[in-house]
Swiss-Prot record:
GO terms for cellular component: cytoplasm. PANTHER family: 12S RRNA N4-METHYLCYTIDINE METHYLTRANSFERASE, S-ADENOSYL-METHYLTRANSFERASE MRAW. GO terms for biological process: rRNA base methylation. This is Ribosomal RNA small subunit methyltransferase H. Its main location: cytoplasm. Specifically methylates the N4 position of cytidine in position 1402 (C1402) of 16S rRNA. It catalyses: cytidine(1402) in 16S rRNA + S-adenosyl-L-methionine = N(4)-methylcytidine(1402) in 16S rRNA + S-adenosyl-L-homocysteine + H(+).
């Protein structure tokens, strides 16, 4: 069963400012929690929802069956956002949502290899047809590449120690499972550091997952496509779960909402220099106390919202 607790659901739905006749895109369908709330508010409008996961798509088709005709499910990575929509004759939309968290079932179903709490073959592929899995990263990538992803994507200060431990272990035998990797990570991190900051494998698993799915590069490309696809007055909502994604989102929004350097004393800003976006939220929205109590995964969630002010 594909059960997934939607994070910042009402804040993001409100942020989209949904019109009953609007065209909307959920780039991260997952458990369809956001998608269901969007289609509920549509009459003549339409929702396009993306996911790479066959299980998620099948579950969503069932969950949204009562709204037949108001939605289209697309099996694709959102890096192909513009291409997939244009193939369906959609060139402008009224709202786009990204929820960049890994779906709870992907974390909780042990066989997917996303979680350090379940023993499974190293996998972590969101798209099960992708050739690169966590197994290849852990067993085949050079030491320097392991250090780079652990430090950059996981912000792991013991990246060198962990990479060295992995390198030595795989010389003896391949590292096959999540628990084998967890034990190596625990051995690599000094005992005092293991006792604080959550599970010792958390940062390493995040880093490998990001590398396997090329998450940061994919999001960086997709967010600019999303900005371009918005009609004037359209909203873009992005929910991030770690500082790398949030920084990337913040930078893209800042770039598109800032004025260029202009001579001082201009009586008015020439129209061609007006920014493309308006920041609806200057600071990110975070989960309230009730949601924090109900869903621990909401602790790191940040929602940023922008509105399209003019065509680029």
């Amino acid at each position: 069963m594909f059960e997934h607790e939607t994070v910042l659901k009402w804040e993001s739905i409100k942020g989209l400012n949904i019109k009953p006749d609007g065209i909307y895109v959920d780039c991260t369908l997952g458990g369809a929690g956001h998608s269901e709330e969007i289609v509920k508010q549509l009459t003549t409008g339409h929702l396009y929802a993306f996911d790479q996961d066959d299980v998620a798509l099948a579950h969503a088709a069932e969950r949204l069956a009562a709204y037949e005709g108001r939605f289209t499910l697309i099996k694709s990575n959102f890096v192909h956002l513009k291409e997939e929509l244009e193939a369906r004759s959609v060139t402008k939309v009224d709202g786009i949502l990204f929820d960049l968290g890994v779906s709870s079932p992907q974390l909780d179903e042990g066989e997917r290899g996303f979680s350090y709490n379940f023993d499974a073959r190293l996998d972590m592929r969101m798209d099960q047809t992708s050739p690169l899995s966590a197994y290849e990263v852990v067993n085949e990538w050079p030491y320097n590449d392991l250090v780079r992803i652990l430090f950059t994507y996981g912000e792991e200060k013991f990246s060198k120690q962990i990479a060295r431990k992995i390198e030595k272990a795989r010389e003896i035998a391949p590292i096959e499972t999540t628990f084998e990797l967890v034990e190596l990570i625990k051995d690599a991190i000094p005992a005092p550091a293991r006792r604080k900051g959550g599970h010792p494998a958390k940062r390493t698993f995040q880093a490998i997952r990001i590398a396997v799915n090329d998450e940061l590069n994919v999001f960086d490309r997709a967010v600019y496509q999303a900005i371009d696809l918005l009609a004037v007055g359209g909203r873009l909502c992005v929910i991030t779960f770690h500082s790398l994604e949030d920084r990337m989102c913040k930078q893209a929004f800042k770039e598109k909402s800032s004025l260029p350097e202009l001579p001082q004393g201009l009586p008015m800003i020439p129209k061609e220099f007006e920014p493309e976006l308006r920041l609806v939220t200057r600071k990110p929205i975070t989960a309230g106390d009730d949601e924090l109590d109900d869903n621990r995964r909401s602790r790191s969630a940040k929602l940023r919202i922008v509105e399209k002010m003019k065509e680029s």
